Amino acid sequence: MKKILLLLLLPILSFSQTLVPSSVHIYLDQYMSETSWDIKDTTGNIVAADGPYYNAVNYQSMIIPVMLPAGNLTFTIYDSYGDGLNGALWGGLDGSYYVKQCNDTLVFGDVPNFGFDTAHAFGSDACPPVLGCMDP
């Protein structure tokens, strides 16, 4: 009976998706309510999204923890005004953005004048094991 139950559950277990702890770092300019972002899989499904940041303060750092599936993904950041995170254009400070996973930076957004949006393709994968003795 246990073998039959295991055989029935095996297809369900084999389709379970590996989720990897990650984080999206958004360093806003002074027009924070214009900024939003999403992460999509290869079929266009949104797997994570946030913004616009109506309640943020100028230049606030937003660190959003997300669980991302393993595989190829696309991070897209949006600016509803069309000047990106280019706050210096209007006498302020520029913003930036990053996607991090397993202490690696997968998306590095240091060009603030991206217009209405910009997309970055990246690969998400399980974190490698930490090597070495873990006993104190």
What is each residue range found by the language model?
Residues 1-136:
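Residue-level recognition of alpha-helix boundary/capping or hinge positions
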